[in-house]
Each structure stands twice: as C-alpha cells, then as structure tokens.
From Swiss-Prot:
Its EC number is 6.1.1.20. Residues 688-780 form the FDX-ACB domain. It comes from Thermus thermophilus (strain ATCC BAA-163 / DSM 7039 / HB27). Residues 399-474 form the B5 domain. Pfam families: B3_4, B5, FDX-ACB, tRNA_synthFbeta. This is Phenylalanine--tRNA ligase beta subunit. Its cofactor is Mg(2+).
Length: 785
C-alpha cells in the first residue's frame, strides 16, 4: 500500500518526518518496503489554459492556443486536448524526467510548437500516457510553475497484514498513530443536504452477499478535472485521476478503506437491484472487456418494469454502460459491505483484482458505510457543485461489535510486564475502544473498523503493540532438571531421520499451510474436511487439511506456472486432521524416469518413485512392499497401497489423469504415508566378505497379477540367503500366451560366514520354481516359450 507522507500528515499534523514515520509504523507492525521520492517537476513546466483547439487537416494532431502568461501555440496528438481545460506545459529547454530529453521548439505540420503539453507519464507523475494531464482551467494563474502547487512528495510503500483491513485506508494508520500519542484530525463531512425525494429505489435479493448496502443521491453535478491537490494525492497513492466525481470515490476509498461506486442516474432505470448473475448474462466492465457472468457472481443491476440488467460486478468493477461521463448530471452513490468470500471468488473467476476487491476481500467496517457516504457527498458538493439529498436508501442491519472482558492484571501476567492499569485503559480508549466497568475486570467494546479484535488476548496484544514490544522486559527462562523425554522425543528423532534420508536421496523438503480449500476435496476426490474454520484468512484456507499431497501438487503447479523445471522431487512431513490428528509423510515426483528402458512411459515415474521408497526403507531396515489397490485420486492402473512390516501405512501411484487435466499438469507421481512407521529393532550385521552368487529368473504370469505378489512368493521360497531381488525386465507379446506377461529378476545369494556352494544356490532356485508352479505361474524357457 502506497502512503503519501503529506496526505497522512493532514490527519496527524505532528508527524516529524518520513523517516520517523517509518520507525513508528514498524513498531506498530507495518513494515515499509521502501521510501520513494516522487514528483520532481522541473521549473520549466508551467500551468497553461487551453484557449483554442484546432484540428490540423489530414492528421490526428491539433493546434492548441495556450495562455501560459503569454499566448503560445503547441501541437498535440492527445485525444482529450480541447478548449477549456488546464494543462502542464513544458517550455523549450526543459528536461523532462519522463522523457529523459530536453523539450525544444519545433515545426510540426507547418505549425511552430512552442514547447509541449504533457501527459502524466511525460511529466513523471504517473504511468498513463494516453492523453494530456487535465486540470481545472482556473487551477492556477497561467504561467505559474507547476512545482509551486505540486511539490515533491515522499511515499512509503507498506506491507499491511491480512488481519488489519482498516489499515488499507490512511485514516486507519492515523488512528494507530493517535494511539501512540499523536493528535488526530478527523476529516470533516460538512454536508448541506436537502430534504428531497429520491428518484430511484433499492432492492437487495441476496442479503448474505450484501449484508449492508446504502445509496446516496447527488445531482446538479459539473463533471470536470479534479483540483490539483486531489490529483496529486491520487497519483502519489498509485491511482490515475479520471474526473472530480470518480476521483472523489477513489479518494474516500483510500482514506477510509471503504470502496464505493457512482452510477450515472440515466442508466439505472427505476433503481438498483443487488442479486446473483443470471446464466449467460454479459457485462462490459470499465476496462472495456466483455465478460460472461457466472451464476455465483454478485452483481449490481438496474431494472425497468420486469426487466433487470447488470450494471457492475459487485465489489470488483463497475460496468461501462453506467459510468460517469462528461455530461453526467446526477448519480446514485453506492457504498456497501459485501461478503468477502463472494468477492474473492468473483475476482478470481474473472482474473480481475482491483483496489476495491482487495479491500472487500479483507473485510470492511460493517458500520462504516453511512459515514463514508457523508464524506463523499460533502466532497462532491465542494468539488462538483452537487446538490445532495438528505435521505439515504439503506438495506441490512449491520451487527455492532460485542464487548470483550479485559483484565489488566491478566495482561501483565500474560506479557510478563507491570504496565499500570490506567495506562492500559488509556491505550484502549485512544484506539477507539469504549471501556465500561471498574477494575479488576472491564468490558471493552472495540471500534467497528477493528475486525481483528475479538478476544481478550487481542486486547492484550494491542496494549503490548502500542506500549512497544521493546518495553517488555527480557527474562531468562527458569532452569529445571531436564525431564526424561526419551519417549516423547522418539517420534521427532524418527521424523528427523526420515528428512535426512529423503534429502540424501535428492528430495527437497517443502512446508505448506495446514489449511486447505474445501473445494480441493471435490477436485482431488477426497472426503469433505471435517474441521472448518469459523474465521478463515481466505476461502482457500477455510478448512484443516486431511492429506498432504494436494499441497505438494499445488506447490508444483505454482512453480510450473513460473518456470518449467525438468524434474522435481518434493516431500513434506506435517499434520493432517481427520477423526484424529495424525502426522503424515508425503512425496511427489515430476519428470521423466531414467534408467528404466523396459517400463512403459506412463509407468516409469511410478517405478522410479517406488525405487526411492525401497531405498528409504532399506536404510531404515524395514520390509516394504506395494500391493495393487485403486484409490479415487490415483490412476486406476498405476496405484497401490504401501505396506511396511506387513502393516498398511499409505499409498503410492500416479495422480489421476482427470485431476491432472483439470489442474493443467503433466503426469505426476506421489505417495503419502502415515507416521510413525512400524517399529523394528535394528541389529548390526557385518558385511559378508564372501562372494555372491547370481541367478536370473523369468516368471510368466497372467497380466493382471500384481508384481508384489510375485516378489513376495520368490522371497519366501528363496530362503535366508537371498540378499537382493531386482526386476530388470517386463515383457508382453509373442511368443508368450495371450493375456500373460514375463517378469525377469536378478537374484543375488550370499552366505554371511562362507562361500555358497552351487548346489545350495540351485536348491534355492528349485524351491522358487516349485513355489511359482504351485501358484500356477510358469518359468520362461522351461514351462513356456
């Protein structure tokens, strides 16, 4: 958020300097990313009035006759160049920061141009370069250096935390500074309203989407450029001035963190209707884009008789049809409180994030709509000559904040401080809280704009924040004999061991939020989450997660959107929340498998990830196998359950292709295991010094037979001297019988104390062959072609 120092100083006149302000805001919890000096306007730029504007035949240029203290002519190609406006004129010899060159006197299309009429970009005050910077024609005496009325500004770029939506308005920051002891000058709403009937009606069909909605009426407007002070403030805050009516709505939004919108009264019909969009409805928004509306979009509509038509996306952006124009004379002024979840979903659906939607998504003061109406209408009176109706149309009854018990003694105990009771109460009052009762227990009602104050601990935190965290005394913790935590620490040691082993195998650890989007339960074909948050930070963090793997998939998706890594190996150890809280380990593999020429392309990643798990469990000394099983979120032909020491602990497989397609992801393989893993005492065994004996075996089995079943059979029959078993070939096709496949294994035998004799190895292989035949399997080359 951009905070112009001079604008904030209008509310807090005692502010010493931008540097002191940065320090004060840091103590209040608002980090400054940078301090920027803007508007270095050269002395050679003066204010000028456009007396005449004549098109130059055969071109899109105009010859302007200006009064800049003396009559001068310039050539301009700006569409908005016209008689009766004020402009910024760069005289010959002026070096412009927005151009990086000096302005000269030139002949253009046979007209001598004495300088240059400037756009905001050319003047260096804004990014917009499509037209002249417009001022009221009487803003300054002609020829006055613009820098005298538009001095250099210092802007602080702040990080505002999600729990403080009120601080997205300068008045919210000013109130916090007031709590530090600075005097606060609240902006006045000197409104001269008239007792007039309103020429429109208000209907709200969706009170959940718009719990509080107000409409004001202003007429007799003179739409014109805003005065210099307002344009300077808006440019400094990062917004482009449009005209005095639209600029007032943006100015009050930046002041109070309360977005608002003005509708040209000629285009709303009989009144304003707040409803959900109809299927197939279309709306051209102010950015010129024709949008097809979604039935869940909350819209502001007008109506005539039985016909209703959309005027804007509620809380996001207005429609082009009802925007304020040069000839607008009357407006309906919307100031509302919308459901944050609804606004966020609409903004995301349409890829349309605006200053208004940003504030509505965080939440606005539920009681702030009427004061914002009065403030905006008073500015319209002052700047646009508006007449204002005293009455407001209002729908909804916002709920005032509830009182919170507060005990100063508890605050000191919680913080480890000894702040005086009177000082704590004074801080809460300076923050705008209403304090009732007597000590030791008070009842504190927070101001309606502080949506984050709900608990006694919130008030304690406010006391510490305003007093300054540096005033909390440092104290060494008390030292006690260390308890015997071996039983408690064991799971953490095992988790640390897992992390070390996976990192050694090339995996990268990630940390994701413990929250999930309830919509992900549908997207990933999971059971609905059991635990929903009452006050989530965002809709996509509204439930406690039930699995880890969706978070890993999201991490991969975000990285693929930014870059295109060839390969990714990710893992996470974290808590999930089902019938009870559990710790899980999840991993993800993305990218082509290597060293697996025998595997089908869709299986190579699966076998590679399975190999990583085999290596992991071999290092842990645990028996591991995978048995085929279908999971709704995994590829039905590439999935299985994971068994460790015979106990089912999780799953392994490829993400279901339909889910991958919905997320626009390439093939992804993943696993998730429940921790802690089954225990098995580790016994050290000397590496054998004796040579190994090798045999290859090709087993022919029906195609649906799971690999794990064959592997388990071979291991059991081979006896105690089988050291390792590796699948090195998978084949289907002639000359094998139809519906069969061949699995070829490397078998390695070794005795720990001596060299194995050939007859011992052959006996073990014979036992394997007999066990396979007894199960109905054959040996390739002996029992089958």
């Amino acid at each position: 958020m951009r905070v112009p120092f001079s604008w904030l100083k209008a509310y807090v006149p005692e502010l010493e300097s931008p540097e002191v302000l940065e320090e004060r805001l840091a103590g209040l919890g608002f980090e400054t990313d940078r301090i920027e000096r803007v508007f270095p306007i050269p002395r050679g730029v003066v204010f000028a009035r456009v007396l005449e504007a004549h098109p130059i035949p055969g071109t899109r240029l105009k010859r302007l006759v200006l009064d800049a203290g003396q009559a001068v002519e310039v050539v301009s190609g700006a569409e908005n160049a016209r008689k009766g406006i004020g402009v910024a004129l760069a005289l010959p010899g002026t070096e412009l920061p927005g151009l990086g060159q000096k302005v000269g006197e030139r002949v253009i299309q046979g007209v001598r141009s004495f300088g240059m009429a400037l756009s905001p970009r050319e003047l260096g005050v804004g990014e917009y370069g499509g037209g002249l910077l417009e001022f009221p024609e009487d803003a300054l005496p002609p020829g006055t250096p613009l820098a005298e009325a538009w001095p250099e500004e210092v802007v602080l770029d702040l990080e505002v935390t999600p729990n403080r939506p009120d601080a997205l308005g300068l008045l919210g920051l000013a109130r916090d500074l007031h709590a530090l002891g600075y005097a606060l000058v609240e902006p006045e709403a000197a409104l001269k309203a008239e007792a007039l009937p309103l020429p429109f009606a208000l209907k709200v069909e969706d009170p959940e989407g718009a719990p509080h909605f107000t409409l004001g009426y202003a007429f007799g407007l003179r739409v014109a450029p805003s005065p210099l002070w307002m344009q300077r403030a808006l440019f400094a805050a990062g917004m482009r001035p449009i005209n005095n009516v639209v600029d007032v709505t943006n100015y009050v939004m930046l002041e109070r963190a309360q977005p608002m919108h003005a509708f040209d009264l000629r285009f709303i019909g009989e009144g304003i209707l707040v409803r959900r969009a109809r299927p197939g409805e279309r709306l051209r928004t102010l950015d010129g884009v024709e949008r097809t509306l979604h039935p869940e979009d909350l819209v502001i509509a007008g109506w005539r008789g039985e016909e209703s038509f959309p005027l804007g996306l509620a809380g996001v952006m207005g429609g082009a049809e009802s925007e304020v124009r040069e000839d607008t004379e009357a407006i309906a002024l919307e100031v509302a409180c919308f459901d944050p979840v609804s606004i966020r979903k609409t903004a995301r659906r349409h890829g349309l994030r605006t200053e208004a939607s940003h504030r509505f998504e965080r939440g606005v003061d539920p009681l702030g709509q009427v004061p914002a109406q009065r403030r905006a209408l008073s500015l319209l009176q002052a700047l646009a000559g508006a007449r204002v109706a005293e009455a407001l149309l209002e729908a909804g009854s916002p709920k005032p904040p509830e009182a919170i018990p507060f005990r100063p003694e508890y605050a000191n105990r919680l913080l480890g401080t000894s702040y005086p009771e009177a000082e704590q109460i004074a801080i809460l009052k300076r923050l705008g809280c209403r304090v009732e009762g007597q000590g030791p227990a008070y009842r504190v009602t927070p101001p309606s704009h502080r949506l984050d104050l709900r608990l006694e601990e919130d008030l304690v935190e406010e006391v510490a924040r305003i007093q300054g965290y540096e005033t909390i005394p440092l104290a060494l913790p008390a030292f006690f004999p260390a308890p015997d935590n071996r039983g408690v620490e064991a799971p953490y040691r095992k988790e640390r061991r897992l992390r070390e082993l996976l990192s050694g195998l090339g995996f990268q650890e990630v940390y994701t939020y413990s929250f999930m989007d309830p919509e992900d339960a549908r997207r990933f074909r999971l059971d609905p989450p059991r635990l929903l948050l009452l006050n989530p930070l965002a809709p996509e963090k509204a439930a406690l997660r039930t699995h880890l793997f969706p978070g890993l998939v999201r991490v991969l998706k975000e990285n693929l959107d930014l870059d295109r890594p060839e390969r990714a190996l990710l893992f996470e150890v974290g808590r999930v929340f089902r019938e009870r809280e559990e710790t899980h380990l999840a991993g993800l593999l993305f990218g082509e498998g290597v060293g697996l020429p025998w595997a089908k392309e869709r299986l190579s990643g699966y076998f590679l990830l399975k190999g990583y798990l085999e290596a992991l469990f071999a290092r842990l000394g645990l028996a591991f196998r995978v048995e085929a099983q279908v999971f709704p979120f995994l590829h039905p032909g590439v999935s299985g359950r994971v068994l460790v020491e015979g106990e089912e602990v999780g799953f392994l497989g490829a993400l279901h292709p339909e889910i991958a397609q919905e997320l626009e992801l390439p093939p992804v393989h993943l696993f998730e295991l429940r921790l802690p893993l089954p225990d098995k005492p580790l016994a050290f065994q000397d590496p054998s010094r004796h040579p190994a004996a090798f045999r290859d075996l090709a087993v022919v089995v029906p195609a649906p037979t799971p690999y794990g079943e064959v592997e388990a059979l071979v291991r059991e029959a081979a006896g105690p001297y089988l050291e390792s078993l590796v699948l090195f070939d998978l084949y289907q096709g002639p000359p094998l019988p139809e519906g069969h496949k061949s699995l070829a294994f490397h078998l390695r035998f070794r005795h720990p104390k001596r060299t194995l004799r050939d007859e011992e190895v052959e006996e073990a292989v014979s036992r394997v062959a007999e066990a396979l035949r007894a199960r109905g399997f054959g040996l390739r080359g002996l029992d089958t072609p």
